[in-house]
Amino acid sequence: MGVEKMKAAFENGKKAFIPYVMGGDGGLEKLKERIRFLDEAGASIVEIGIPFSDPVADGPTIQRAGKRALDGGVTLKGIFQALAEVRKEVQIPFVLMTYLNPVLAFGKEHFIERCLEAGVDGIIVPDLPYEEQDIIAPLLRTANIALIPLVTVTSPIERIEKITSESEGFVYAVTVAGVTGVRQNFKEEIHSYLEKVKSHTNLPVVAGFGISTKEHVEEMITICDGVVVGSKIIELLENEKREEICEFIQATKQKEEA
């Protein structure tokens, strides 16, 4: 499990499609069922959001999903239990997207113990600056759980090199300024930014934030090693448009074979 399992998602030129689901949106049984569906549909990795009351990096769709989960009484303990149960049925790598506050409130050591029990392979902490990652990075390294770095369009080359040189799993390249959410298109400089990130790390580079159409997927996958689709996946799951999710996954696979 852990770092090696995520490496396998990118082996031999594979392109990774990484859908995002909000933990507990619709209940914990729904979370398990959605993970089973995404695994069967051919997703490479599943990113599970931990609902939080002050989600500064999230756009309106993900904020609403998190609020639904919290209003429904979902807890971090409950999410870990659901993941541990569904882990027995699926092999797909789990990556948690969590803000730092829930980790600290739960207790760092306890959080990582539960990650191990639930079969979590990596975590993303969007509000944890690189300079402060020692709050949790050594514990994760010991547990063989990847702390996945985020880099942005405004990150200088030196910072990208520094961040990625000490990281594992993959690099999450944020493709827009601001919060997550559906976008119509991407500025041309995004291409050169992604190529810059790719040229300064040996890790797979995954594009995320704002990717919401098959055309976006096809555009990004020609430059990157994978894509994260969040807000759009939440919308499609909420409206039971699962065939469209399968089309997203197929678009990734077709680019892989091209």
From Swiss-Prot:
Database matches in Pfam families: Trp_syntA (PF00290)
Gene3D superfamilies documented for this protein: Aldolase class I
Gene Ontology CC: cytosol
Domain of life: Bacteria
Top-rank EC class of the record's enzyme: lyase
Pathway where this protein functions: Amino-acid biosynthesis; L-tryptophan biosynthesis; L-tryptophan from chorismate: step 5/5
Active site: 47, 58
Protein name: Tryptophan synthase alpha chain
Source organism per UniProt: Bacillus cereus (strain AH187)
Taxon lineage: Bacteria, Bacillati, Bacillota, Bacilli, Bacillales
